[in-house]
Amino acid sequence: MSCDAYYCSSRYSPKRKSWKKVIHLECGHDPQDAIFEIDDGVVKEYQSFILDRLTVDTSELHKPLIKFEFSSLIQFEGEDEETYEPEVEVDLLFKLERVCNGVKECLRSWRYLKEFDVEDPEERDNLELEIEISEPFTVIFCDKNICPGCCEYRMVVEGKDFEGEFEFLRVVKPVLTALIQGYVSCDY
């Protein structure tokens, strides 16, 4: 039997690529509370903590997209007294970092700033301010600029600026999750 054009096209079709959407969920695998060191009421400078991390492998994915969600609880107790203008301030910087092939990159940062102050406009009376806070801090970020391969993503918090005397300052119950969407090749 000879292979003519009709016979070949009706009996044989070359494999074509099709794409199947896949979605994965990754959860952080090493959550750590950030307990800031305080010396005689003063928060020590330059403290940084990795709150949670996760690993994502996009090497088999076409057009990967990653949606990150991070949540935590920020807690502090601070005071300022014996001044006509007492102030308590907490300034934290949260950073989502990606580490691929040993190269670290900050994808996005968020600032948490809480400032309380009262004042005596006549500057005669010494006032006192005491604050105790426990509130959630949550962020969402989508990453589209993804290089194929295995990368670690981590959420970091840094102490930036503080006013007042503190009993404690901490970021607790950190949770980092990622939804990974992409397409895998399906030959048929």
What does each model-found stretch correspond to?
Residues 2-188:
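Extracellular jelly-roll beta-sandwich "head" domains, especially the C-terminal globular C1q domain
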